[in-house]
């Protein structure tokens, strides 16, 4: 059985939702810290461009994946192991939002949101936990401040409450395995989610630094949650 080492250059981080936003920022910060990377998202072109930017084969590989597709998630995990023989950390980050108001969005968009944000994250866990057991690794999930407070009429908030529960459910289920579980809960962040940049929002890099902080802890330290708000955000 492999074990977690203190040297990031020997370790492999798999990121879903890696082609833009928080995922891409985290990939860049992790690469700078020496991690090898498996980059997963739907956009092959953007993934391959990012993988090349971060060192190409041997340092970063693209693993195109629709997280709502179980077979695609299995291939993603298999591709990661084929490339690097191990997975030491997984950042289940794929997700998106939508307008508030139960009459303001379409049922089709709701369905895609629930499948991506909740079902997709659950499939990522299922696909990668066997490898994380081998490495005694680290599982991180992107939830949100919206998963801690209720946003009126927000299906996005509903999905993030589910992610908050999923993180704790996974932590308890994996107790004793050596796998650490961290829930990342950003507040208002300037991501592709917004058409216009929110004033005083966090940057993707702010969230990426929080992820790297959790990953930098020694194996006996399990940072369960990191909730990050911009100083201008009250709720």
Where are these regions (language model features)?
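The beta1-alpha1 cofactor-binding region of Rossmann-like NAD(H)/NADP(H)-dependent oxidoreductases
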Residues: 45, 64-76, 107
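C-terminal helical subdomain
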Residues: 179, 183-184, 197-235
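Active-site helix of classical SDR
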Residues: 125, 159-160
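Conserved glycine-rich cofactor-binding loop
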Residues: 19-20
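Residue(s) in the substrate-gating loop at a strand-loop-helix junction
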Residues: 144
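Substrate-binding pocket helix/loop in short-chain dehydrogenase/reductase
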Residues: 101-103, 109-111
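Conserved glycine-rich Rossmann-like NAD(P)H-binding loop of the short-chain dehydrogenase/reductase
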Residues: 33-50
């Amino acid at each position: 059985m492999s074990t977690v080492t203190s040297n990031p250059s020997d370790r492999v981080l798999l990121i879903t939702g890696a082609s833009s936003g928080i995922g891409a920022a985290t990939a860049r910060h992790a690469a700078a810290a020496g991690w090898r990377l498996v980059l997963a998202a739907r956009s092959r072109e953007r993934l391959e461009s990012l993988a090349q930017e971060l060192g190409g084969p041997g340092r970063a590989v693209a693993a195109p994946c629709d997280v709502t597709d179980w077979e695609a998630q299995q291939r993603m995990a298999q591709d990661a192991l084929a490339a690097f023989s191990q997975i030491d950390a997984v950042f289940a980050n794929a997700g998106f939002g939508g307008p508030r108001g139960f009459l303001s969005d379409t049922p089709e968009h709701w369905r895609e949101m629930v499948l991506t944000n909740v079902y997709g994250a659950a499939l990522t866990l299922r696909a990668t936990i066997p490898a994380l057991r081998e490495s005694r690794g680290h599982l991180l999930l992107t939830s949100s401040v919206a998963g801690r407070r209720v946003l009126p009429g927000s299906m996005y908030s509903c999905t993030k409450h589910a992610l908050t529960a999923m993180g704790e459910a996974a932590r308890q289920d994996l107790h004793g395995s050596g796998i650490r579980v961290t829930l990342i809960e950003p507040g208002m962040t300037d991501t592709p989610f917004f058409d216009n940049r929110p004033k005083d929002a966090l940057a993707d890099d702010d969230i990426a630094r929080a992820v790297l902080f959790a990953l930098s802890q020694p194996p006996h330290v399990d940072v369960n949650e990191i909730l990050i708000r911009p100083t201008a955000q009250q709720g």
